[in-house]
Amino acid sequence: MQEIESLHQSVLLQEVLQAFAPLEEGVLIDCTLGLGGHSKAILSQKPHLKLIGIDKDKFAQEIAKERLKAFEGRYNLLSGGFAKRFKEALEMHDKEIKGVLVDLGVSSLQLDDDSRGFNFHSHALDMRMDLESDLNAQKVINSYPVVALEKIFKDYGEIKEYKKIAHKIAERRAKKPFKDAKDLSDFLSSLSKNKKIHPATLVFQAVRIEVNSELEELKEFLQCARNLKEAILCVISFHSLEDALVKNAFKDYAKNCICDPSSFKCTCSNNHALGEILTKKPITPSPEEIKNNRRSRSAKMRVFQFKP
């Protein structure tokens, strides 16, 4: 456990604590509990706050449970996708919910575990957050039709040469299926000489998003979060696709006028805002945090305060 404490660094921890500083009591939902770093820090600072922690990775949840032992009786941990579980928690607790945290990053535990297939040197081709899920990266890479690969590389990886890469993968797998993440990473490296970013980065991102339905889950969550009252919502994203969804959702929440944009005159009374955006620009890690934890460098945090 001491090893986990030293290796796992919660991204933007002080900024998250500051975002939830106004909370004194009620329920905070950590939609992506992971190893429990953010939750542990929040519970330590807020003795009257209770926690609902959600994660689809049962192994990570066991570690989080051990780390939260000192707060026995103040938390409840749920397994499953965060959009579905959040909706259930909202229906059950409603006005008790005062804070919601979503950290969309892959945990260090998952990234560093070679059996999970998230890193370029992994001797597995998996990428599942939920190990009980049927779809994994090997099925996507070795079985998806070329047109489906093109779509996920274009939509989820924003890869310019999405057609070329999809066809090259199809040609190679016809001769010899990809056996693990390292095999795929090495193959992708042979196709590109890009020095700024590892050639496999965007393909791995696209496949991981597909395997875990990450963007669909985020969309579902953001739609459900509209029903929050007098709560602080804090979302940490790690790539432009996630951040765009969060940014646009927050803008939508803050709209006073809900008339058709083509209308010449407002007829809706112009008072429909669900609250206010507390971060006009996303909060990003300090140079010091990036130096201590390179994986934090792409993090962006946005915060919204819902009205009563």
Curated annotation (Swiss-Prot):
Keywords of the record: Cytoplasm, Methyltransferase, rRNA processing, S-adenosyl-L-methionine, Transferase
Keyword tRNA-binding attributed: no
Binding site for S-adenosyl-L-methionine: G36, G37, H38, D55, F86, D103, Q110
Substrates-to-products reaction catalysed: cytidine(1402) in 16S rRNA + S-adenosyl-L-methionine = N(4)-methylcytidine(1402) in 16S rRNA + S-adenosyl-L-homocysteine + H(+)
NCBIfam families, sorted: 16S rRNA (cytosine(1402)-N(4))-methyltransferase RsmH
Subcellular location, principal: cytoplasm
Function in brief: Specifically methylates the N4 position of cytidine in position 1402 (C1402) of 16S rRNA.
Compartment(s) where it occurs, according to its Swiss-Prot or TrEMBL record: Cytoplasm
GO biological process: rRNA base methylation
Family under the similarity heading: Belongs to the methyltransferase superfamily. RsmH family.
Disulfide bonds: none
InterPro entries associated with the record: RsmH, SAM-dep_MeTrfase_MraW_recog, SAM-dependent_MTases_sf
Pfam family, one: Methyltransf_5
Species whose genome carries this gene: Helicobacter pylori (strain Shi470)
GO molecular function term, any single one: rRNA (cytosine-N4-)-methyltransferase activity
Keyword Hydrolase among UniProt keywords: no
Gene Ontology cellular component list: cytoplasm
The protein, known as: Ribosomal RNA small subunit methyltransferase H
EC numbers for this chain: 2.1.1.199
